[in-house]
Design a protein with these regions (language model features):
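N-terminal secretory signal peptides that target proteins for export/translocation
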Residues: 1-12
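Short, hydrophobic alpha-helical membrane anchors of single-pass surface/secreted proteins
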Residues: 13-17
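Bacterial N-terminal signal peptides
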Residues: 18-30
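A residue-level marker of the well-folded mature domains of exported/periplasmic proteins
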Residues: 37-350
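Conserved functional hotspot residues at active sites or interaction interfaces
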Residues: 357
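Short, solvent-exposed mixed-charge patches
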Residues: 360-361
Length: 361
């Protein structure tokens, strides 16, 4: 009898040890998940950034930040599949799918074709793409767009209130909707703040030339501009860096350029950066994951605006002490007015054209 009893104890110990090992192994596999979540509750989410990695001080990094926040708040397991080049887009999306992710998020319009193709081939997987949209969608694909006209208007309001010369500058990469949908509302907002303000507008016809951007900024300052807003990628970063170091107020775009261009305040001129007109990619990614977790994910275009914190002005950072409180209050009031639908921020130019005084070189 004692021999049989000993065998039962060994069996029980082995069973307990096996269960314990399985439990510990599950913790290693998913260190970011809640202990309250059972494996069947966990949702797998993959992020495929654009080339450049998740430390790009841009959309990739913001998307990764939104994913990390979702890991903290929801029962999800995340993975990132960075392509080394554009040639790897399709392969990395396929890797995301084959790993069992229920949602695969891609970043940037360059990945549009690869994302659409993957959505068509994998109808049981949800897909979302940052900063790209289509006219029609399959049932498992979401395009995230951003109300750049709202935050552009807000940036213009600030520019108009801060300008003493009554001349503001705008530098665009190309005369295309993603650029002009920031720039013309910027003008509109500035002229609401001060009807006498005029805008100098120059297109660089190049997104990748910071030296050219700096030259255009200096030219606009020579023509009287004391606030410069650049919507021109690295060309624009060169413009605002030069302008700020020469003593003009500047406004960045897309991301908080206080960190990407001014090194978090370590680069000369940061005190002349008023703000940045941001696309809050982090919030868009977070809310898309939240929809999947809640079972409310829908296909089509997701508009990220001031109301849902999908766009917004970056903090004033080192310039805050130089921005009068009544100006800060006015900008906050205009933001609320836009959210309430009380302020017309300008119809995109391809819908209808308005005539405002522009000085174009």
């Amino acid at each position: 009898m004692s021999h049989q009893h000993t065998g039962q104890n060994k069996t029980q110990r082995r069973l307990i040890l096996g269960v314990t090992l399985i439990f510990l192994f599950s913790l290693v596999l998913s260190p970011q998940t809640s202990l309250a979540a059972s494996p069947k509750d966990l949702i797998l989410v993959g992020l495929i950034p654009d080339e450049g990695g998740i430390d790009d001080n841009g959309f990739n990094e913001m998307a990764a930040a939104g994913l990390a926040r979702a890991v903290t708040d929801f029962s999800i397991v995340s993975a990132i599949y960075p392509p080394a080049s554009a040639d790897e887009y399709a392969a990395k999306i396929a890797e995301c799918v084959s790993a069992g992710n229920e949602l695969c998020i891609t970043v940037g319009y360059s990945m549009m074709d690869a994302t659409m193709n993957a959505a068509g081939l994998n109808i049981d997987v949800d897909f979302a793409i940052v900063d790209a949209t289509w006219d029609t969608y399959p049932a498992n694909l979401r395009g995230m767009t951003f109300a750049s006209e709202e935050v552009g208007y807000l940036a213009g309001t600030l520019a108009g209130l801060m300008s003493t010369s009554k001349i503001i500058g705008a530098i665009g990469g190309f005369p295309i909707p993603p650029v002009d949908n920031f720039i013309f509302p910027y003008q509109y907002g500035a002229q609401w703040a001060d009807p006498e303000v005029q805008m100098l507008l120059d297109y660089a016809y190049n997104f990748m030339n910071p030296v050219l951007g700096a030259q255009i900024a200096q030219d606009q300052m020579a023509r009287g501009a004391d606030v410069i807003f650049a919507v021109a990628g690295p060309t624009g970063n060169g413009a605002i860096l030069q302008a700020a170091q020469d003593g003009a107020w500047t406004i960045g775009v897309d991301v908080d350029v206080y960190y990407s261009t001014f090194g978090g305040g370590t680069v000369d001129g940061s005190e002349y950066l008023l703000t940045s007109a941001m696309k809050r990619v982090d919030n868009a990614v977070y809310h898309t994951i939240e929809d999947v977790v809640n079972g409310t994910f829908s296909s089509g275009t997701m508009v990220n605006n001031l109301e849902n914190e999908g766009v917004g002005l970056a903090p004033y950072h080192d310039a805050e002490a130089s921005i009068p409180q009544d100006v800060q209050d006015a900008v906050a009031a205009v933001m609320q007015s836009i959210i309430n639908g009380e302020t017309d921020v300008w119809e995109p130019f391809y819908k209808y054209t308005i005539n405002l005084p522009i000085t174009m070189k």
